[in-house]
Amino acid sequence: MLTATKSIPEHYLQMTQEELKNHIQSIKDTLGDRLFMPTHHYQKDEVVQFADITGDSLELARICKANTQAEYFVFNGVHFMAETADILTDDHQDIYLPDLSAGCSMADMANIQQALHSYDVLTQHYHLDILPLTYVNSTAAIKKFVGEHGGSCVTSGNAKSVVKWALQQGKTILFLPDQHLGRNTAYDLGVPLEHMAVWDPIKKQLDYDGRHDQLRIVLWKGHCSVHEKFHKAHIEICLLYTSDAADDSLRV
């Protein structure tokens, strides 16, 4: 992925919305299939209007991989999404992220230096045989770290099967960076909460009072800042207002 950054030229800042729209469309028309603009479905309408395809982050990365014609990918999303697309596309294809400061709060909660330190402490101080897993919403450096230590990437859709596989390896899982996905998935697979611990990358310590030989999964203290705002009461209110709906529509 190209990481050079430049300030926006003044003449673009002086353009009206209509002028910008026409200019972008002119470039798209000129480059044709050489340019591909995957766009995350959380983007604003003013960006989505130029999208060649919209979808979630993993879907867009797979679509980029399948596109062998495009030379330039302008990925309208956040940093880890563009990195994932860059991993999957060919070397001669360039990935551009319009705003290099566009980040995911959860992905930013686990950097490679923190991951390496946690691995050293867990293996050398606590003498744990660690198998790392990372949610796909993580940096390329974290994905590389996980792969180098025999682990795997996890999606929301395959989390249960991947965590089940990891548990069968007889090692202690280090799950980054979404502690809630790791905890809920492991719990659904029968791992008791008392056999789970939380690693705090800021305090650089393990939050666990049990026996280390019973520890099945270490959860990275990370989370989605948006999901943290949802509470049980929100669901109860939604169910209250949809109480007249058909039973099938209420099954979550």
What are these regions (language model features)?
Residues L2-D90, D94-T134, I142-S156, G190-L193, ...:
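Metallocofactor- and cofactor-centric catalytic cores in central/energy metabolism, strongly enriched
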Residues H23, E59-L60, V162, H234-I237:
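Well-ordered alpha-helical segments embedded in enzymatic catalytic cores
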Residues M109-H117, W165-I173, H231-I237:
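Short, surface-exposed amphipathic charged segments that create phosphate/polyanion-binding patches used
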Residues V162-D209:
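Loop-centered beta-sheet repeat module
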Residues Y241-D248:
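Conserved small/polar residues in nucleotide/adenosyl-binding loops
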